[in-house]
Amino acid sequence: MKKRCIYQFLLVCISSCFLACNGYLEEIPQNKQKLTSTDDYEQLLNKAYLTEAVLPYIDLLTDDISYIVADRDPRFGNVADSYLGAYMWDNNIESTMPNGDEVFGKFYNSIYYTNVVIDEVDQAVGISSNKEETERIRGYLKGEAYALRAFRYLYLVNMYAPPYDPATSSTTPGIPINLETSADDKPYTREMLDKVYEQIVDDLKKAIPLMEENYVNVKKNRFSPIAAKALLARVYLICKNGI
């Protein structure tokens, strides 16, 4: 009888352990924050903007920057020389950079954040009791995420793919397109150039009405409906009305 009671006690303990383990596995990992409110998604979108830190290096590829070695400020040492390859349009500009070419990785990280906002913000809880205001904020954030994603892809395709030519765009490799939020480690193939630009245009066409119909006054460093329209016009100019 005593042994039977012990067995029953052990069985209860083991069952409790399994139940506890199941509950533990259902918990959100400590290194992953669960987004619930519109404010949470706005903060994530702000993080997607932070990759602007790599844009000064991109400016070196344009005519906006001049670099005169004789006038170099000695206080900065040879820091500017690290990016001289970009300024000179060397074939291997990453070789002199202290951290290599960061644009590709940082911009795809930014795209991942915009994907999360686009997929999930419709279920976000408002920080106020005003339902109409919550709906408006959701809509604007979603539109803003579409615009920012298009902006990132436009930069990437212009940096890592040949120029757009309507005659050859359907057979010219462009860049990978990722519209998912899963963290699966899988290879991505390069889409053809016309598909990349079609995705950019599609994102902007979704972004503009969402931001116009749900207008929210945001800081100047974030996308507005006018900025999205200007970006769409630029895309059409690049494509020479071939898309």
Enumerate the language-model features and the residues they cover.
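Conserved, well-structured interaction surfaces
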Residues: 83-160, 191, 209-212
